[in-house]
């Protein structure tokens, strides 16, 4: 009997005719009249060479969703925000008054640095405040984390050398970020979740409404693992992620929102860590992605690194010191490189001054140099060359030429680099459209999609595509594609296979993502086994393998034995993403952190309020002086001293209780002032109202009214 562990194999040969229904999407080519390849399940360590007989693929069913009937999720009467979770900066937007609006953060800025830090006192900092202290705390400041999300350690060997914190791998080969300040190792999803949490908190304050649902954007060329990891980050942050959409697609939504004319646009998205190109048809509320291409290892960080390496190599040649081994110096070099890159977008040269970058026995050392725009472009020439290929690929996949493009939309801060803009002009022969803010357009587009899902926006249909092909491992280490790239989402396809060996009772399905021909060059995003197949001659069992991709671009795969009805399925989460129980733990920790943050904020607010009460009380005691009766003054001073002690060392609740007690005593001051006899009022009846002094208005004189108490407004003429 064959081994129970098996995989899919493929052979050439004559086989059964294939029945196939054509897709409504023009990107698909099912070739219904061609003779199918022979595909069957066989042993992983099969001793066979070429079997003389084998069953072929028995049929193909394409259940691709109709192009214009994608039903949106409806969320009634709840604010849904759009979030651009960027490598270097993030932004959040929402629909306000029928238009997408950027949310300003607590610091008053429209974008938030994607930076998280932990201090020696174990305080957590997020955003601009975290970025500002990076130089003095490089090992505990996490930035460019998006480059590690959903990735395995062997995929990010080069990126891990470019950051000042320590990137390590866990027992499963997944990426972890070491934080010595609190003695913990974070998954990239956890750090991203903290950035998301700040964005959502800022949005809640801005909108004056609790936000729990969001649309999050990802680079178009993110694979399945990275998309699922991004969704996990949202869940850890306490969000329900309604949709994951591609960044260029989001940018097209912002650009094409309220535009009625039909246009073919090319979105050129060069951000901090990734590069994407998408070609879309836009018009009459329909946004159809024709093709997408990109490079997840190319972005503004790489341009910064070229400048850092240049500075470090020049310094090493002059001084013999390698600054790249000094984490604090590396962080200063990185910040200086970013600043110089930004300045060279508007200047032809910039001065770079880094005093006291290091020190030797001869004294402190400094960097003082000038970087010209020409030198910068020379340092980054190979990066600029890498931009060409994805642009050409996207047009070829869309079966278009540059003359067919009506508009070129620039997205991402790195598109402000003059050399990048010049390259776009040369490639496309068109002047780039600069009507949208490259830092904000993705978040604005995500807000439009959020509006569609919440019902705030109607008459918009978004037809996105899968960026990478999906398939199975077959004989000889070859990848057989089931869903080709640029297939419109959501989609569903199935194929029927058979076994390769007599008596085979189990098959193993290895799911792959990528464009290369061989398994070793593509990414394995999951595998599972279908057991319990009745022993039968090879080619007899019929095993249907079905691929489903939802609107988020996340894949589910199922395999069923048509003879027994036995079924096995899996939602592909990728080998590098977090197990469900680990995500659940992180969600609980995030909730605990949120509670702790709320308690810390409450403690700070309470202390500030108590300090104000102390100041006002002392001021009142000083102004009223001897007018306050001795016993009342003693009680107030006692409570005042107690409150000062509680502010210094008490709990938040103790401060609140003491503050309330002090306020009660302070109220007695006013009561005692009105109850005590006034000068000239010695004949007033006990417990009665004190009569006015002789120089007050005659209407206030009540001494001759037989002791009657008269209610009246009291006016101090002084």
Curated annotation (Swiss-Prot):
SUPFAM superfamilies referenced in this protein's UniProt entry, alphabetically: Actin-like ATPase domain, Heat shock protein 70kD (HSP70), C-terminal subdomain, Heat shock protein 70kD (HSP70), peptide-binding domain
Superkingdom of this protein's organism: Eukaryota
Induction or repression: By heat shock.
Family in the record: Belongs to the heat shock protein 70 (TC 1.A.33) family. DnaK subfamily.
Pfam family, one: HSP70
Protein name: Heat shock 70 kDa protein 7, chloroplastic
Ranges where the record places region Disordered: 668-718
A GO BP entry: response to heat
Molecular functions per Gene Ontology: ATP binding; ATP-dependent protein folding chaperone; unfolded protein binding
Amino acid composition bias (Polar residues), ranges on this chain: 668-678
Function in brief: Acts redundantly with HSP70-6 in the thermotolerance of germinating seeds. Plays an important role in the protein precursor import into chloroplasts. In cooperation with other chaperones, Hsp70s are key components that facilitate folding of de novo synthesized proteins, assist translocation of precursor proteins into organelles, and are responsible for degradation of damaged protein under stress conditions.
Loss of function: phenotype: Defective in protein import into chloroplasts during early developmental stages.
NCBIfam families reported in the protein's UniProt record: PRK00290.1, prok_dnaK
Name of the coding gene: HSP70-7
Keywords: ATP-binding, Chaperone, Chloroplast, Nucleotide-binding, Plastid, Protein transport, Stress response, Transit peptide, Transport
Presequence positions on this chain: 1-92
Spans through the membrane: none
Localization: Plastid, Chloroplast stroma
GO CC, one annotated term: thylakoid
């Amino acid at each position: 009997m064959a081994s129970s562990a098996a995989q899919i194999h493929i052979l050439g040969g004559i086989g059964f005719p294939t029945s196939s229904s054509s897709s409504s999407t023009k990107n698909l080519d099912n070739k219904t009249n061609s003779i199918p390849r022979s595909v069957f399940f066989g042993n992983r360590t099969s001793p066979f060479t070429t079997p003389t007989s084998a069953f072929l693929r028995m049929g193909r069913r394409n259940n691709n969703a109709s192009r214009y009937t994608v039903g949106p999720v409806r969320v009634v009467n709840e604010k849904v925000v759009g979030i651009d979770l960027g490598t270097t900066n993030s932004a959040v937007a929402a629909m306000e008054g029928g238009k997408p609006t950027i949310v300003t953060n607590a610091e008053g800025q429209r974008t938030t640095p994607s930076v998280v830090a932990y201090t020696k006192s174990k305080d957590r900092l997020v955003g601009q405040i975290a970025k500002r202290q990076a130089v003095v705390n490089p090992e505990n400041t996490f930035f460019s984390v998006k480059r590690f999300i959903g990735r395995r350690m062997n995929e990010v060997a080069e990126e891990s050398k470019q950051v000042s914190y320590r990137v390590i791998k866990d027992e499963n080969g997944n990426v972890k970020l070491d934080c010595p300040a609190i003695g913990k190792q974070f998954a990239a999803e956890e750090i991203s979740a903290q950035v998301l949490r700040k964005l959502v908190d800022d949005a809640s304050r801005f909108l004056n409404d609790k936000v729990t649902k969001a649309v999050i954007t990802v680079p178009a060329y993110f694979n399945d693992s990275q998309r699922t990891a991004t969704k996990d980050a949202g869940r850890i942050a306490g969000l329900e992620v309604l949709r994951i959409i591609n960044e260029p697609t989001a940018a097209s939504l912002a650009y094409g929102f309220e535009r009625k004319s039909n246009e073919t646009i090319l979105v050129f998205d060069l951000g901090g860590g990734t590069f994407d190109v998408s070609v879309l048809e836009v018009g009459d509320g329909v946004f159809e992605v024709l093709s997408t291409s990109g490079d997840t290892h190319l972005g503004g960080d790489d341009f910064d690194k070229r400048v850092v390496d240049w500075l470090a190599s020049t310094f090493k040649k002059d001084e013999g010191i390698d600054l790249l081994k000094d984490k604090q110096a590396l962080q200063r070099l990185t910040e200086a490189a970013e600043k110089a890159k930004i300045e060279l977008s508007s200047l032809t040269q910039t001065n770079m001054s880094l005093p006291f970058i290091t020190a030797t026995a001869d004294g402190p050392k400094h960097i003082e140099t000038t970087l010209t725009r020409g030198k910068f472009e020379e340092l980054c020439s190979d990066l600029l060359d890498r931009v060409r290929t994805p642009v050409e690929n996207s047009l070829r996949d869309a079966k278009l030429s540059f003359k067919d493009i009506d508009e070129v939309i620039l997205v991402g801060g790195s598109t402000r680099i003059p050399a990048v803009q010049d390259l776009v002009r040369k490639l496309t022969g068109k002047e780039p459209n600069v009507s949208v803010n490259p830092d904000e357009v993705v978040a604005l587009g995500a807000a439009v999609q959020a509006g569609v899902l919440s019902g705030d926006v109607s008459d918009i249909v978004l037809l996105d595509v899968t960026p990478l092909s999906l398939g199975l491992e077959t004989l000889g280490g070859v990848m057989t594609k089931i869903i080709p790239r640029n297939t419109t989402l959501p989609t569903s396809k199935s194929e029927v296979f058979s076994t390769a060996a007599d008596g085979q009772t189990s098959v193993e399905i290895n799911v792959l993502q990528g464009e290369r021909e061989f398994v070793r060059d593509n990414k394995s995003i999951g595998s599972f086994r279908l057991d319990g197949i009745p022993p039968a001659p090879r080619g007899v069992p019929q095993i249907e393998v079905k691929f489903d991709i939802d609107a988020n671009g996340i894949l589910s795969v199922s395999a069923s034995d048509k003879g027994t009805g036995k079924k096995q399925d899996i939602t592909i989460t990728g080998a590098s993403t977090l197990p469900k129980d680990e995500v659940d733990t992180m969600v609980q920790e995030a909730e605990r952190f949120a509670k702790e943050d709320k308690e810390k904020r409450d403690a700070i607010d309470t202390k500030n309020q108590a300090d104000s009460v102390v100041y006002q009380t002392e001021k009142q005691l000083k102004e009223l002086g001897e007018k306050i009766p001795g016993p009342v003054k003693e009680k107030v001073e006692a409570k005042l001293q107690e409150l000062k002690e509680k502010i210094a060392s008490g709990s938040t609740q103790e401060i609140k209780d003491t503050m309330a007690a002090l306020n009660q005593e302070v109220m007695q001051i006013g009561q005692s002032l009105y109850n005590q006899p006034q000068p000239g009022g010695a004949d007033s009846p006990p417990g009665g109202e004190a009569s006015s002094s002789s120089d007050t208005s005659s209407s206030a004189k009540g001494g001759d009214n037989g002791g009657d108490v008269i209610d009246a407004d009291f006016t101090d003429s002084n």
